[in-house]
Amino acid sequence: MNKTVKAGLPKKDEEFFETSLDFFVENGNTLQKICPDYVDEYNDHSLLKLVSIAYWVGFFSPIAHRQLREKYGYRVAYVDTMAGSGVTSTKRSGDYFCGSCPGALLSARKYPFDLVMAVEIDPKKGDALKKRLETLLPQQNVTVFNKDIADVSQGIAQELQHKTISYIVIDPQAFQGMTWAGIGPLLHCKGDAMVTWFEAEFWRMKCAACSQNEHQALEADGQRLTELLGNDQWKNAQSAEELTKIFITRVLNDCDKTAHAKIKIPRSEGGYYWMILFTKAAKLADEWKKHVEKRINSAHGRDIAVLLDVKAGRTSTLKNWIKTE
């Protein structure tokens, strides 16, 4: 397991995806053999999300090392707030990927994190994640919390206060764990954060809460949106994009982040969700968006299912299938 996703390289699309497939699939196959009964199940296009998360490590870790660790003695931390088991299985064909947490740690091996904290509410998946990380990177300092993020975020944030720069990943399943009480303390921490934002789901929640607020369950949806977004301006949102903008604005205003960039991840079944990066490094955020978005929108990015079939030997070879655009 010695292949890493490197950021900012001017690779052709086929080279980029060959490297990414090797990295995520080969490491996923290796990690799956540890606690094989416990994996997370997603669609093929979750690979694009994992690429987005790992790619930012290529910007973040060397800069944090040179500008803060070496000069001022900072610790460099990685926090995965909804970490899962560390292995993803695709629903369509059962291919394995390494998850966001091992993917980020492997991508940072040249400038490794001093501190790694992962949160996984399912104790069996959390235990599998810990064993996988210990096997994969035995020298890495890793803490896994088997709790809801709302119960541990304050404690994690306190741990990150003293001379620590962090990269925080907030990658929920739809709404799970998406409360300001849970994610707000971490978004306030010094460093960068990446949030998976399910725009369509939040828009449906908003529409339901506005249309029938006399029902208790729908009232609860409205209260949840108010808690997450900071006020009831969501009621006036005229589109899903406007609702997303309200969330982004709150993070920028309340959490000492000065820039953001977002990448649209297409879903296999149609629709999309966003990967939103919050940072102070506006130029680097634009570079991240440019590089990753170009790959996702290429013919290769649009045909992840075919690439996985090639990788698994279910169709012709990768070099025969891929043509440079």
Regions found by a protein language model. Give the residues of each.
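A conserved mid-domain beta-alpha-beta active-site/ligand-binding segment of alpha/beta enzyme cores
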Residues: 205-274, 279
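SAM cofactor-binding core of SAM-dependent methyltransferases
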Residues: 48-155
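Conserved proline-anchored active-site loop of SAM-dependent methyltransferases
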Residues: 76-91, 162-177, 195-199, 278
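Short amphipathic alpha-helix with an adjacent loop that forms part of the alpha/beta core around
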Residues: 152-162, 184
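A short, conserved alpha-helix within the catalytic core of class I
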Residues: 175-186
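Flexible, glycine-/basic-rich loop-and-beta segments that form/coincide
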Residues: 282-312
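Conserved beta-strand signature within the Rossmann-like core of class I S-adenosyl-L-methionine
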Residues: 190-204
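Class I SAM-dependent methyltransferase Rossmann-like catalytic core
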Residues: 14-75
